[in-house]
Amino acid sequence: MKKYILKAFMLVALGAGMTSCGDTFLETDYYSGIDTEDALTSISKISTALNGTYYNLYHYSFAGNYAINIGDIPTDLSYWNGKTGHFDGIYTFTIVDTDTYLNSIWEYGYKVADNAARIIEAIPALYESATEEEKAELELYLAEAYSLRGYAQLMLTNIFCHQIKVNGTDFSSEPGIVVINTPIPAFEKVSRSTIGQSYEAVLSDFNNAITHFDTAGGDRGQLQYFGKAAVYGLLARTYLYMENWDAAMSNAQNALNAADISTLTYGNDNYKALYNSETSNTESMFALAITASQNWSANSSGTLWSSYNYSPSPKLQALYGENDCRTSIFAWDSKSTPEVPIFKGGKFSHFSSGNPAYATNYIVNAPEMFLIIAEANLYSPNGTINNAQKALLTVAKRNSDITSIGDLPSTKENLMSFIKDERARELFQEGLRLYDLRRWDEMAEVNATQAPNISFVYTNYKISNLVFPIPSAEVNTGYGVAQNENWSSTLPQRN
């Protein structure tokens, strides 16, 4: 595998400060193996390694920007005004296997997975000499390590592999990722698992996380650390992609129960307040520890959706009703024009400071759970139209013109069409649109142009075929990672 050097990062305290860590157990080549077998020999070192793993998760190369925004940028929801050159290759589908963004996502995704695997492997050896209190602490760390690895491998599978299910068609036998069950010995040849095996590994990690949270007596109860609600939410998302409707419904409800959320926020002022700061979103179950004092500045998601010139597409803007509170966070720079729009951040506005670079990424959120329950009810033999409508209404009431089930469609086909649009309206900037379009087998419109008109360079694009390339730097090392065959043929062609 390609030898990316794991820099010795640690997070002294999530949300408090990022500094360099001198522990050499993090100074290893991921995929080149473990330098020593007994490096993680104390609870304090486990804690340090776990914080380092969170740091890699939060990095702008992964969940802090690239791995999230790649789920929105090449879709019908985003608009690039052409004034800067960020993500432009992805947006315009002039994609190459040396793409910087894909390379960074691959690198940091595997940093998270590899470091988490080291922690998971090391913890059992510390149990024998640990006190009961220390065992509970180790169980908590183990739960979070499983959560981190599961999330990283889910993201890597979605980005670098085919969708596991596309409108009922199974692609689980297609090439998946290199699954990191245990740290890989130095210079060992590897191979890609199937997509199905990759998803099995993800589910196993999330289920193990829940088990160890229970054994630990609960989670930390802090938004910037993985906890039970977030993991249930990720299980729901994973099962949704697998079209396991009953499991998707039950885990989405488990997430809402664990977070003690039964309704959402309505009204312009209240909705806008959700995005005041890095901890203001009361609907969120997991967010990154990005703050006004510790952030990625020019490399932040907020910068991408403001001065780096991405904004909601004219198509997306047209989907909102006149009285939809979600448009309360849509604001435009003083230099913005209809033809050259300059957005001010949206969900990354960080209204308390007015600086989008300070904004966090809210990763797992309650509205997604209600929408999962709604969609799953339409397809599960145990679901009902009425239950789908009730779950959907909780989100759809963001538009104050919708007040009751009677304002929603009453047939499966029309209700599903509404859910598709509602996921666009609600989940914009959360990085889920690409996977929605692929799994629904939508004939997509991408590369929006000619604002303020609704116009796209590519239309009628079978986006479910889209597979990004594995970075050539990885493939060319000769450690066994095969390229996605014919990936370039899955890109859209001009009509």
Where are the model-predicted features located?
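Acidic, glycine-rich segments characteristic of secretory precursors and extracytoplasmic regions
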Residues: 21-71, 273, 478-495
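Bacterial Sec-dependent N-terminal signal peptides
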Residues: 1-31
